[in-house]
């Protein structure tokens, strides 16, 4: 639905246009303007744990809805380089084109890689400042699993997850046990909702209060 709704919008925000997905519709002067707050919510979440992505290197696992939002917004935030990892599925070619377009638009080095190439993945994480899981691994039937092995972590890494149920995924727990700074998915969930509320009503959602009392 986030993808299909784009064609019904009168305008798209820069982020929504690059992502090809809308999660928030603003009615302004009789026009429907499509926004995507997922990526910005993710960036706000990692900034809240003290990580500024500008000029950094990131490895993002997953190129679906969440992954696309994450790596697109990171590029808009002017990171130095992004390694995107995904399985070679039926969307591989279209993802490759989207990644190339993003790189051309932002001037950021963005590349797509096969998640099954574990040696290459390990090398990418080794040179990265930020590691993001933007897949469903860690939730639902995949709860208790991780796409990342502990040996791939290093002491200069910040680890983030887009999964918010459970509150602490295996990846986040593993990173915490390793002594790393982490950002769980519930923060992204709340931040993207706060950005949507700001667009709709012009009000500031009490994110810290909600997270403390309801999660």
Which residue ranges define each predicted feature?
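Phosphate/diphosphate ligand-binding glycine-rich loop within oxidoreductases
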Residues: 1-49
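Short helix-loop-beta connector
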Residues: 28, 51-57, 154-155
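NAD(P)-binding Rossmann-fold cofactor-contacting core
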Residues: 79-106
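Rossmann-like adenosine-cofactor binding region
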Residues: 108-182
